[in-house]
Regions:
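Class I SAM-dependent methyltransferase SAM-binding "motif I" and its flanking Rossmann-like core
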Residues: 120-186, 236, 249-253
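Class I S-adenosyl-L-methionine
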Residues: 2-28, 33-138, 223, 228-229, ...
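Short, acidic/turn-prone active-site loops that include or flank metal/cofactor-
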Residues: 25-26, 50-52, 76-77, 147-149, ...
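A short, acidic, amphipathic alpha-helical segment used as a generic capping/interface helix at domain edges
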Residues: 100, 105, 175-183, 197-206
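Conserved beta-strand scaffold positions in the cores of enzyme catalytic domains, especially
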Residues: 18-20, 71-73, 141-143, 170, ...
């Protein structure tokens, strides 16, 4: 990577590289050997965070950060009062991602590599993908795979998820109730992400699909404060960002 930040043969500064590093589900010990090496070597580290809160990605990577690295915090806009399917929500996030691109691009054009920390895997429901889509045509981008958040939840819940020829479906809970119920009914096993303010709707969809009795609720899987229970036993409809619902498969076994 250092060669990317050097001077080219004609004396013009070479462009830097964007390095997306997957951090795994939350436990720093689930950071891969390669990710730890890349983080430790990074001169510029960027990470997403909610304004006024510690970055979860930075907290995971903290044991591996070089003490003299430059840090760039990318603070999400406050969108909790705007429904995700409204134009204002999309426009707010679009402006945010364009601002992030501007900041990162300035570093890359100056010949500096930027390591962008990503919870879970960089290419699964991650903000890194928005940087990748906007910068890939001009800059070199390296991607270090991470243990997915769902894998961390499988292990935390001690749930075999897909047997034999089971079909495993990954769903965002932001879908409308009818689509959730339909998808849950037609698959063998499911992972439902982005529970947030969608838990009551998901519960209803699972009852309609006939899977509520085998659904597992995992909150903060592979993180401090981990909670695991049968979904039907959860008494309230509050679900934080770091929560998932699992519907284990029951397919062919030897």
């Amino acid at each position: 990577m250092n060669a990317l930040a050097s001077t080219s043969r004609d004396g013009v500064a070479a462009l830097g590289a964007l390095i997306g590093v997957g951090l795994g589900p939350g436990d720093p010990e689930l950071v891969t050997v390669k990710a730890a090496r890349l983080i430790g070597a990074a001169k510029v580290v960027a990470f997403f965070a909610k304004r006024g809160r510690e970055s979860h990605a930075r907290a995971i990577a903290a044991p591996y950060l070089a003490p003299d690295c430059e840090e760039i915090a990318l603070h999400y806009p406050v969108t909790t009062e705007i429904p995700f399917d409204q134009p204002e929500y999309v426009e707010s996030l679009q402006r945010f991602y364009e601002d992030c691109v501007t900041r990162i691009r300035a570093m890359l054009e100056a010949g500096r590599d930027v390591t962008l920390l990503c919870e879970g895997d960089p290419l699964l429901y991650g903000s890194f993908m928005h940087m990748f889509a906007r910068l890939d045509q001009r800059f070199r981008i390296e991607i270090c795979a991470g243990v997915s958040g769902m894998s961390g939840c499988f292990a935390a819940a001690r749930q075999p998820m897909a047997w034999g020829d089971d079909i495993l479906t990954v769903l965002p809970a932001t879908l409308d109730e009818d689509r959730l119920a339909s998808r849950l009914a037609e698959t063998d096993a499911a992972v439902v992400m982005k529970l947030g303010g969608n838990f009551a709707k998901l519960r209803r969809a699972m009852i309609r699909a006939g899977v509520i009795d085998r659904a597992i609720y995992v909150e903060r899987g592979a993180m401090p404060g981990e909670k695991i229970m049968r979904l039907k036993d959860k008494r309230d409809d509050d679900a934080p960002y770091f929560s998932m619902a699992l519907v284990p498969g029951r397919g062919r076994r030897p």
